């Protein structure tokens, strides 16, 4: 399995809502990252399986540029890939696991779908909360989580780790049936 977390590189974006994919990978393994030309990577063991963690270093809207290099580097197929990214239409505390689908308006996922030529890419969408009325979408997704939101997000990351283990052991359908209806609260 190759878990690709989406985000933007650099300290300016490190803790923003849009970087929830990178933040989840750091939750799983926060040191000893190695860097290739188009991505940073690491490995962990989950449910007795070696799992590669990948952060494209191309900026969010160009995430697809890294994907052919990721597939080649890890000798992976499309079926091995799970993409993790933020979803402004999902409430903070919720995740959605899917086997395939459209980009849903997310430019990072749009870039990946275009680069790989298919919508049949497994993904975990992470709710980042409701944008306050009147606030610009870009300002919201590039804003940082509050202390209270971090408490929820860390619990969400625990649930996501469990979901990855279920995907590895019992399959994505089982994970969808367990986790798509859950909501993490303080």
From Swiss-Prot:
Annotated signal peptide: none
Gene Ontology BP term (one): protein quality control for misfolded or incompletely synthesized proteins
Residues reported in the UniProt entry to bind tRNA: 13, 59, 61, 107
Record-marked site positions (Discriminates between blocked and unblocked aminoacyl-tRNA): 8
Recorded catalytic activity of this chain's protein: an N-acyl-L-alpha-aminoacyl-tRNA + H2O = an N-acyl-L-amino acid + a tRNA + H(+)
Active-site positions on this chain: 18 (proton acceptor)
GO cellular component: cytoplasm
UniProt site positions, description: Stabilizes the basic form of H active site to accept a proton: 86
Compartments, record wording: Cytoplasm
Alphabetic keyword roster: Cytoplasm, Hydrolase, RNA-binding, tRNA-binding
Keyword Disulfide bond in annotation: no
UniProt subunit comment: Monomer.
Gene that specifies this protein: pth
Membrane-spanning ranges: none
EC number(s) recorded for this UniProt protein: 3.1.1.29
UniProt function note: Hydrolyzes ribosome-free peptidyl-tRNAs (with 1 or more amino acids incorporated), which drop off the ribosome during protein synthesis, or as a result of ribosome stalling.
Gene3D superfamilies membership: Peptidyl-tRNA hydrolase
Keyword Repressor: no
Any one GO MF annotation of this record: peptidyl-tRNA hydrolase activity
Species this chain originates from: Thermotoga sp. (strain RQ2)
Entry similarity comment: Belongs to the PTH family.
PROSITE patterns referenced in this protein's UniProt entry, alphabetically: PEPT_TRNA_HYDROL_1, PEPT_TRNA_HYDROL_2
Name of the protein this chain belongs to: Peptidyl-tRNA hydrolase
